[in-house]
A protein has these predicted regions:
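Short, small-residue-biased leader/transition segments that mark boundaries at the very start
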Residues: 1-7
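Catalytic grooves of carbohydrate-active enzymes
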Residues: 12-14, 18-31, 152-162, 168, ...
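Catalytic domains of carbohydrate-active enzymes, especially glycoside hydrolases
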Residues: 15-28, 38-71
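Metal-dependent polysaccharide deacetylase catalytic core of the NodB/CE4 family, i.e.
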Residues: 30-32, 64-173, 237, 242, ...
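A solvent-exposed, charged loop/short amphipathic helix patch at secondary-structure junctions
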Residues: 30-52, 124-135, 251-276
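Alpha-helical scaffolding within the catalytic cores
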Residues: 56-57, 90-100, 194-201, 219-231
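Short, surface-exposed basic-aromatic patches at helix termini and helix-loop junctions that form
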Residues: 100-102, 175-185, 234
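His/Asp/Glu-enriched short active-site or ligand-binding loop at hydrolase and phosphoryl-transfer sites
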Residues: 182-222
């Protein structure tokens, strides 16, 4: 290197986002179905009691200890109906309990779905990758409007503007519905990395006014690839964006057999590393 190239006069700068967000997908939501044998093994509790007395208490402890904020993405029900014949959720006690605690902790309520069926049109063939159903456009509109109504009924006078696609799957047709029919939604938080039917994004303000903000890493199985992705995103945009599902503890592919104690420890290790590595990173909601 020449002395000219190495001169301290040559300093470059560029704008960064400077924000850290932790998403809770499927939260608040009804108690999910799934194999709770590892929850039973480790805690001798059913799934509902485990979420209330263990998982949520632990997640809130990270708020108290590290100052992070959660954006919860609501699922109204886990039914498979995509006909557009929507109905309101009658059992709201868990939504109110968890949602209000989330808000009081400095968090935010967002939208995930009327159910957990991605907004994909009838013309889409999942080719066996997913067993999800598909929608007519009018049914998508009905379902999303019901979700907005439901959230507003439970959490009035609270801004709710973030949409998280179920399984990070969102079609062009579904996105069009969000933009044209659901004015409450101002931003979509999906995935930075491409995958089967994934709605992958860059950080940007789209020409139609929607804010695109991808999530970078997920869960409590934070392998070398995820750690590299997290480090790279801090370098590029000075951003952390992580999401986790409560039902990771029920899904072997997401670490259920390891047990919540291990997943929790991995997550806390990441949060602690983040705080020590980037102490000036702002704790934000989506």
């Amino acid at each position: 290197w020449s002395s000219d190239v190495c001169s301290s006069d040559l300093v470059a700068s560029y704008p960064v986002i400077n924000g850290s967000v932790f998403y809770l997908d499927d939260f608040p939501a009804p108690v999910p179905s799934g194999d709770g044998k590892y929850v039973k093994r480790d805690y001798n509790l059913n799934v509902a009691d485990f979420y209330t007395n263990i998982w949520w208490v632990d997640m809130l402890s990270f708020v108290d200890k590290y100052g992070i904020k959660y954006t919860g993405a609501t699922i109204e029900n886990y039914e498979d109906d995509t006909s557009g014949n929507v109905h309101g959720q009658d059992d709201i006690s868990r939504f109110v309990y968890f949602g209000n605690m989330l808000l009081r902790s400095g968090g935010e309520i967002g939208y995930h779905g009327y159910n957990h069926q991605p907004l994909s049109p009838k013309s889409l063939d999942y080719k066996g990758v997913y067993s999800y159903h598909t929608w007519e456009e009018s049914a998508m509109v009905s379902a999303m409007k019901e979700l907005v109504r439901f959230n507003e009924e439970l959490f009035p006078n609270v801004e709710k503007s973030v949409y998280v696609p179920p399984s990070n799957v969102l079609s062009a047709e579904g996105r069009k519905v969000l933009v044209e029919e659901i004015p409450e939604i101002k931003t979509i938080a999906s995935s930075y990395f491409p995958g089967d039917f994934a709605y992958d994004q860059e950080f940007e303000w789209a020409s139609d006014g929607m804010v695109e903000q991808p999530r970078i890493i997920s869960g409590g199985m934070l392998d070398d690839f995820m750690q590299l992705a997290a480090f790279s995103e801090l370098n590029m945009h000075f951003v952390n964006s992580h999401f986790i599902h409560p039902d990771d503890t029920l899904d072997v592919d997401r670490g259920a057999e390891l047990g919540w104690a291990v997943l929790k420890s991995n997550l806390e290790h990441y949060i602690s590393w983040l705080k020590s590595s980037a102490p000036d990173l702002r704790d934000l909601t989506g």
